[in-house]
A protein has these predicted regions:
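Domain-level recognition of nuclease-like catalytic cores that cleave nucleotide substrates
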Residues: 74-127
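Conserved catalytic cores of phosphodiester-cleaving nucleases, focusing on short active-site segments
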Residues: 14-44, 57
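Short glycine-enriched, charge-decorated loop/helix-capping segments at active-site entrances
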Residues: 40-46, 83-86
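Surface segments flanking catalytic/ligand-binding clefts of nucleic-acid enzymes
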Residues: 19, 64, 109-112
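Histidine-anchored nucleotide/phosphate-binding helix
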Residues: 52-62
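Glycine-rich phosphate/pyrophosphate-binding loops
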Residues: 63-76
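A short acidic/basic microdomain associated with nuclease active sites
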Residues: 1-9
Length: 127
C-alpha cells in the first residue's frame, strides 16, 4: 500500500495519491474555517485553483480512479459543510458536478491544538 503526498495528475498537484491493492485514488484536502450559525462554508474567498482541482478530480473519477475531496473542518460541533455559493458560485457548481460524476466529497471536524490536528467525526456535506 502507498500514500504519496504532492502527487501529480493531469495538470494538477493533489495532496495525496493512495494505493491499496488494486484501488488507486487521488485526494485533495481543504481546510474549512468559515462558520455561519453552526454551518461551515467553503471557500471563504474565490479560489480558481480550487475549481481547477475539482475539475481534475472529476476527470480522474471518470477514468475509473477513486477521487476524494476532503474538507477538514477546524471548528468543533458544526452541523454541516456546504459550498459558499455567495462568495464563489463557480466552486459550488464544479463541486456539485464532480460529485455527480463520482468524486466523493467528505467532511470531518477535528480537535486543534498548538501541536496537533486530530480528526474527530464525520460532518454532513450539503451540496
Amino acid at each position: 500500500d502507498i500514500i504519496r503526498p504532492e502527487a501529480f495528475y493531469g495538470e494538477s498537484r493533489f495532496d495525496f495519491y493512495l494505493e491499496a491493492g488494486e484501488k488507486r485514488a487521488f485526494a485533495e484536502v481543504k481546510g474549512v474555517t468559515l462558520e455561519r450559525e453552526g454551518h461551515c462554508l467553503f471557500p471563504d474567498a474565490p479560489t480558481e485553483r480550487g475549481v481547477k482541482h475539482i475539475r481534475e478530480l472529476q476527470r480522474a473519477a471518470e477514468t475509473g480512479l477513486d477521487a476524494v475531496l476532503f474538507f477538514v473542518v477546524q471548528i468543533r460541533d458544526i452541523h454541516s459543510v456546504a459550498p459558499n455559493d455567495a462568495t464563489h458560485p463557480a466552486f459550488g457548481e464544479a463541486l456539485r458536478e464532480a460529485a455527480a460524476h463520482g468524486v466523493r466529497v467528505l467532511a470531518y471536524d477535528c480537535d486543534v491544538t498548538p501541536d496537533s490536528l486530530k480528526i474527530r467525526r464525520e460532518v454532513p456535506v450539503i451540496l
